[in-house]
């Protein structure tokens, strides 16, 4: 369905009165399907899919491997005539348009999410994160686990509000170089490319803005001034069926501070590596990043000393697809090397205690984050911040003195019992325990191997007297 919707919206871009842009060659456009039925419709649609797959550049990448999975021609005609073609998608309100298309994207990636444990980020949270990080036209924004591109589109929309005053080079930068996405999944990468093209980012003939690869495997060499991300939770680095690296395997990189199989810690290390000096990051990470010992403690010390780790947003449960997920948003800035710690004070906002959300009946809305955004004081000096019931600050000395630098900080009393609806199923809990134990065993084996190798080294000869 996303292929058909892309064709229809591409046709609308080609025929709009102002600044028409043809993304798809006319011979493969959606109007070629109108008025057809039966086998002729099916054959024509298959011809269009094959033709688009053979195109160079981003368009070919989007349609490569595309297949018509609607086996009944009458169903295909109904979908085209009664749903896709009767709507003028580009004339709809931009937010409604984006919601509709991204809902289709998420439906298309539904199997991927449930199978590979990928977490699509609530739009309200994306918007709030972008508002406080405040990307500008001078930035380059990257999401190393971009999914269908939600963070990238939100950052682009935020900066585009001032587009009327941009110079031609700035407009070109905004369209072709402002955002970059990386995702390991073939499906999600393709959907992200389609999403960006339909929102006016990139070009059919230009370089792809979405790179399909495992972001954790190697340092890309490039650096970005803004990182916005919600890396997939779980132990492997996969976010798509069939696209996994070795599940549970430790990642060895020279630019990493520690070697671990914990995917969230590795994504944090990767983001630390690709963030430019004075760059800003907003990253969604699970609770274990705040309290896990060993590699986790080492990275927390690094964040507090070599970075300005200034804000922590404790997220409520019930906002992700998997019940019971407990996560946070870490906001930090990369600073030049210095003798003194860069973090002076960590501000923590508790949006979790006594807050109850569900995906359908009580979803997280943008207004639920109004107080956090107001407390953050985007663009203003952080010494102007003022504490409140849910908003407290902690000095570097107090943080570094905590046992194992545990940053799992709470102070509000939880007055409600744990809701059964927010608890994972027993088999899910059991599987997560197995994954944690397996990952811990891998790390212990690596430590043991290193110790054995060190013990096997010959002792240096004693100096002559």
Which role does the model predict for each range below?
Residues 115-229, 234-236, 241-243, 250, ...:
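Conserved S-adenosyl-L-methionine
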Residues 96, 100, 121, 125, ...:
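Helical mechanochemical/support elements of P-loop NTPase systems and associated helical scaffolds
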Residues 6-10, 89, 105-109, 157-160, ...:
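Non-catalytic alpha-helical coupling and interface elements of nucleotide-dependent molecular machines
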Residues 1-137, 204-215, 314-317, 342-358, ...:
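Non-catalytic, mostly N-terminal accessory regions of nucleic-acid modification and defense proteins
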Residues 165, 243-244, 305, 452-456, ...:
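Short, intrinsically disordered/low-complexity patches at protein termini
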Residues 141-145, 150-151, 227, 274-275, ...:
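Structured catalytic/translocation cores of nucleotide/phosphate-coupled proteins
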Residues 97, 104, 108, 189-191, ...:
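Long, contiguous hydrophobic alpha-helical segments, chiefly transmembrane helices and signal peptides
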Residues 217-224, 232-399:
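Signature of N6-adenine DNA methyltransferases within the class I
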